[in-house]
Structure formats: structure tokens, C-alpha cells
Design a protein with these regions (language model features):
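Primarily recognizes the serine-hydrolase "nucleophile elbow" in alpha/beta-hydrolase
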Residues: 148-217, 224, 229-234
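Bacterial N-terminal signal peptides
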Residues: 8-17
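Short substrate-entry loop that stabilizes the transition state in hydrolases
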Residues: 83-87, 96-137
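Alpha/beta-hydrolase
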Residues: 93, 199, 313-316
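Mobile cap/lid helix-loop segments that gate and shape the active-site cleft of serine hydrolases
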Residues: 49-57, 193-194, 198-270, 276
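The conserved beta1-alpha1 loop
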Residues: 91-95, 282
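N-terminal cap/lid segment of alpha/beta-hydrolase-fold proteins
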Residues: 23-85
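C-terminal catalytic histidine-bearing segment of alpha/beta-hydrolase fold enzymes
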Residues: 279-281, 285-298, 302-344
């Protein structure tokens, strides 16, 4: 049965590439079964057959480059083997536990796939590892250090330090928005980025705006099993994005604070004043709380005259939206690439 699924998936991908970019129909059906959870192994089971096996061709990869004082402050750089320099740079900041590589069953190419897509589309890719911090803005400081590393070093990897774009997903939105929204975290060249894509953002601090409660909680659901899938035995760090890397700092600086302090920590004023162009995107199968917050964020920015590009990815889930890049399905990457090219 599994072979049959992927036989039709490959056919569908080919058809989508020739006609209209979309989630392959069989995979779209399976994603509905998988549901609105953080279903990494289940979604990787569907998408891994559509990706090449490493080692990859046509790309130079440097892994685990240090960008900060913590041993976990590392990033990967993907650049083309051939071709010129001064390319736009895509800095990817993942969701979940912040891992730049998922690992686990079928997880070996995620999120190399985002980097490979970037290189194939004329960019240099940088994949950042996230980790917890001791202060409320500790993870945001890490984002700032990664941006500064890119600004200072990416020219030697064929990148243009003046055209750096951040693509962040899920939990990665929290430290990214804090970095952009607080100029005291910026480096000597200012914010250091040309644009930011907030993909499937969970609620972050945009006080005084407060997202209304979603009926029934609206959070992530349980994961259904796609056809032919057998769940692996549970292991630590199974890629489901629970635990240490939720994008907020940990330790004594993270605890409960009074209302005035919380308001002062709001990202909204700084997001508005930064003048950085934003794209906000959600998946059709994202849970209601994600979609609700994204729409509120869009509205607050628009009220301030800072309307963001807003996209909903049809048939995609919270996880498939980041596993589909570098396949024939360009329903996610097409709008992203168009937006990047539109930013002057």
C-alpha cells in the first residue's frame, strides 16, 4: 500500500509541476487524516520520498559554524558551487525545538530542503540552531548574533549582506519577533535584515493587542496515522517540537512579571517602527489559535500603516508547509519567492 501511495504521489507532483503547483492530491488527503497537530514523523513519512538523498549536488555546505559564545550557537551555510556572488540570503529559523536538522525516522533532509530550495533559486541559505536562554529575551539575542554573523561574513559565501531575509516558522517566530521588535538587540548596522516571513506564528507579545480566546482552546490536536505508517518507538527529541525550544527564554529572567513590564516587552511598537517588510503566512490546516493570532497581527500592523503580505497555504498543514520546499509543489515557495523579489 505504501508503494501505491508514493507512486501516485510522484505522478501528482509531476502533474503539479507542469500545470498548477499544489499539494499532490494523495498527500493532501493524507494530511487531512494526519490532522492539525505537530505531526513531524507522520508528515515526514509522506514527504521524505519526494526529496533527494544526501550528499547533495551543486551546493557547498558548511555545517556547525559558531556564531556566538554558547556551544549551541551554530549555523549551517549552503551556497552554490558555481555562479556569482552578491546573492540574497535566506536565514531560516525553525520551529519546534529549534533543530536545524530534524533527525529521527525520515527526518534527515529537513530542514536542508529549505536551504536547497534557496540555493536553487539564486540565494545563499543559512540555517540557524535555536536553544533556550536564561533571560526572557535570551533566544532573541541569539537571533541577533546570527544576523550579525551573516552581515559580517556572508559575502565570503557568495551572499549579499544587504539583502538578508528571515524565514521563521512556528516557535521560531517568538525570538525572531522579539529581536525585530526591540532595537536594543540590533547590531551596529541596525536591524540587519531586509524582510521577515512570519510563518504559522504562535501568539507572541503584541500588547496592548490581546488575541481573544479561541473556542475549545483552538490548539494543536492529536496526530492521525497516514496510510501505511507505523509509529516509531518513542525516543528523546522525536522532532515534535516539545520542550526546550519554544522560543522563550528560561531561567530566573523568564518568570511572571507585572503588567507594566509585560507591556514594555511588547514587540508590536518595535515591529511597526522597524520599517522591515513582513510576510505573514498560515497553513489551511493550522489550528485555529495560530490562524487567529496571525490575523490579529496582520490587523495591528495594518492599523499602523504597515500592512504585511498575507498568504494562506491551501491544503497544507503546520508541518507540511516546511517539508514541501524543494519539491515540485511550489504552492508554499512560489509566494515566498515572489515576495522576496518584490522587496526593494
Amino acid at each position: 500500500m505504501q508503494k501505491k501511495i508514493f507512486f501516485w504521489a510522484v505522478i501528482a507532483v509531476g502533474a503539479a509541476g507542469m500545470a498548477q503547483a499544489a499539494v499532490p492530491p494523495q498527500i493532501a488527503k493524507e494530511l487531512v487524516t494526519v490532522g492539525k497537530g505537530v505531526c513531524v514523523p507522520e508528515t515526514a513519512f509522506l514527504y521524505r520520498p519526494l526529496h533527494p538523498n544526501p550528499p547533495y549536488t551543486g551546493v557547498t555546505i558548511l555545517r556547525d559554524i559558531s556564531f556566538g559564545p554558547d556551544p549551541k550557537d551554530v549555523l549551517d551555510v549552503f551556497s552554490p558551487e558555481k555562479g556569482g556572488s552578491k546573492r540574497p540570503v535566506l536565514l531560516y529559523i525553525s520551529g519546534g525545538a529549534g533543530n536545524k536538522l530534524q533527525g529521527g525516522p525520515n527526518g534527515d533532509v529537513f530542514y536542508d530542503n529549505v536551504m536547497l530550495w534557496a540555493v536553487k533559486n539564486g540565494m545563499v541559505g543559512v540555517n540557524m540552531q535555536r536553544h533556550p536562554g536564561q533571560e526572557w529575551n535570551g533566544p532573541a539575542k541569539d537571533v541577533g548574533m546570527a544576523v550579525q554573523w551573516v552581515n559580517q561574513n556572508i559575502a565570503s559565501h557568495k551572499g549579499n549582506p544587504d539583502r538578508v531575509f528571515i524565514w521563521t516558522q512556528s516557535a521560531g517566530n517568538i525570538p525572531t519577533s522579539t529581536y525585530i521588535g526591540h532595537s536594543d538587540l540590533w547590531g551596529p548596522k541596525g536591524v540587519g535584515v531586509k524582510g521577515v516571513l512570519f510563518m504559522s506564528p504562535p501568539a507572541f507579545d503584541i500588547l496592548p493587542a490581546t488575541p481573544p480566546p479561541v473556542q475549545g482552546g483552538g490548539g494543536f490536536g492529536a496526530c492521525g496515522k497516514p496510510t501505511g505508517y507505523t509509529a516509531p518507538a518513542p525516543v528523546a527529541g522525536d522532532g515534535r517540537g516539545r520542550g526546550a525550544g519554544d522560543g522563550r527564554g528560561r531561567g530566573p529572567g523568564r518568570g511572571q512579571v507585572d503588567a507594566a513590564t509585560q507591556l514594555a516587552r511588547s514587540n508590536l511598537p518595535g515591529l511597526i517602527s522597524s520599517k522591515v517588510p513582513f510576510m505573514i503566512a498560515v497553513a489551511e490546516l493550522d489550528p485555529p489559535n495560530i490562524t487567529s493570532f496571525a490575523e490579529i497581527l496582520k490587523g495591528e500592523l495594518c492599523k499602523a500603516g504597515r500592512c504585511a503580505t498575507y498568504v494562506t497555504f491551501k491544503d497544507h498543514s503546520h508541518i507540511s508547509e516546511v517539508m514541501s520546499p524543494d519539491t515540485a509543489d511550489t504552492s508554499v515557495t512560489g509566494p515566498i519567492l515572489k515576495w522576496i523579489k518584490s522587496v526593494k
